[in-house]
């Protein structure tokens, strides 16, 4: 997104906006469109092709740190792999800080309602605990999160570990 720029606009939410997109592409003589992005962008790409009546061929390149696109097993998007690798390195550094300072740290990973990135970071670094929305349900109360974190801290203390990192 740095070179090509980014957009958070979703024209599929409005028939008028969708029509404007197709009209603009047609007026520019666009016959082939390559989209790069996540699930919203993939859906928008299919809608553009449909609304254009086959006059615009669309190719979508999956790129999302959420890793929530329905791709074949073991085929993550390149945005996810980059974020997971960097996130793992950051968590490893924080784990060393936690150990040397006898502290606990909480790390929050991006991903909206998908926990793939948090799980990848936590597993890759060997975090003390990793919480993901898929395991906690749709409505996550702060009390539930605090209870889980408290349990993990107490368990660590019982093993003589006065430090840890939760992702």
Model-derived regions, located:
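Residue-level detector of flexible, active-site-proximal loop/helix-junction positions
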Residues: 10-11, 65, 136-137
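Accessory alpha-helical/coil subdomains and C-terminal extensions
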Residues: 24, 32-37, 43-47, 51-59, ...
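Gly-rich Lys/Arg/Thr-decorated short loops/hinges at beta-loop-alpha junctions or inter-strand turns
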Residues: 1-8, 63-75, 100-102
């Amino acid at each position: 997104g740095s070179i090509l720029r980014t957009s958070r606009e979703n024209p599929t939410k409005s028939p008028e906006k969708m029509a404007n997109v197709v009209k603009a592409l047609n007026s520019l003589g666009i016959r082939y469109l390559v989209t790069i992005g996540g699930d919203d962008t993939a859906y928008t790409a299919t809608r553009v092709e449909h609304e254009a009546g086959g006059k615009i061929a669309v190719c979508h390149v999956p790129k999302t740190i959420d890793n929530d696109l329905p791709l074949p097993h073991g085929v993550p998007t390149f945005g996810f792999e980059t974020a997971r690798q960097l996130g793992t390195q950051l968590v490893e550094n924080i784990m060393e800080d936690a150990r040397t300072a006898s502290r606990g740290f909480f790390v929050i990973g991006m991903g909206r309602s998908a926990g793939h990135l948090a799980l990848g970071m936590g597993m890759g670094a060997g975090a003390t605990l990793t919480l993901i929305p898929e395991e906690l349900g749709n409505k996550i109360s702060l009390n539930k999160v605090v209870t889980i974190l408290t349990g993990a801290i107490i368990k660590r203390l019982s093993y003589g570990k006065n430090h840890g990192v939760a992702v």
